[in-house]
Amino acid sequence: MLLSLRKNNEFRTVYRRGKSYANDLLVLYVYPNRKNVTKDGERFNKVGVSVSKKVGKSVVRSRVKRLILENYRLNSSELKEGYDFVFIARVAINGKDFKQVGKAMNNLIKKAGLRDNEKIVHSND
C-alpha cells in the first residue's frame, strides 16, 4: 500500500529536518520518521511528490507525478522502512519517459543508501 504525505507540516518537517539528494531530473528529501510504525510494530514509508508550475501545464505536471509514483511503487519493496520521502521534479523532467525517470530515481535512492538489498525492480528489462 502506498501511503502519502498530505499535510503541509509533514512536507515542511521533511524539508527542514531531512537530508537532500539531487540529480538533473529530481531532488529527493529523506527523513527517518519514528512515527511511521503500525500498532503491530511494523515500520512503513510515506511519499510525497512536488511538481512546480515551471515544469508545465497541469496535464504535464500530473503525468510527471504519475511517473514518479509508479516508479516508487515498483521499487518500494526494496527500500528500507520508516522514512518519509519527498520527490521534487525539476524542469528538465518535462518530456522524459518512464525509464529515464526510473533511472533518475534509482540513482537518488542509491546515493541516499536506502536500498534494503541490491536488487531493484526495473520494468521492461
From Swiss-Prot:
It catalyses: Endonucleolytic cleavage of RNA, removing 5'-extranucleotides from tRNA precursor. Keywords: Endonuclease, Hydrolase, Nuclease, RNA-binding, tRNA processing. One of its GO terms (molecular function) is tRNA binding. One of its GO terms (biological process) is tRNA 5'-leader removal. Its EC number is 3.1.26.5. InterPro entries: Ribosomal_Su5_D2-typ_SF, Ribsml_uS5_D2-typ_fold_subgr, RNase_P. SUPFAM superfamilies: Ribosomal protein S5 domain 2-like. GO terms for cellular component: ribonuclease P complex. It is an enzyme of class 3 (hydrolase). RNaseP catalyzes the removal of the 5'-leader sequence from pre-tRNA to produce the mature 5'-terminus. It can also cleave other RNA substrates such as 4.5S RNA. The protein component plays an auxiliary but essential role in vivo by binding to the 5'-leader sequence and broadening the substrate specificity of the ribozyme. HAMAP family: RNase_P (MF_00227). Consists of a catalytic RNA component (M1 or rnpB) and a protein subunit. Belongs to the RnpA family. This is Ribonuclease P protein component. It comes from Clostridium perfringens (strain 13 / Type A). The gene is rnpA.
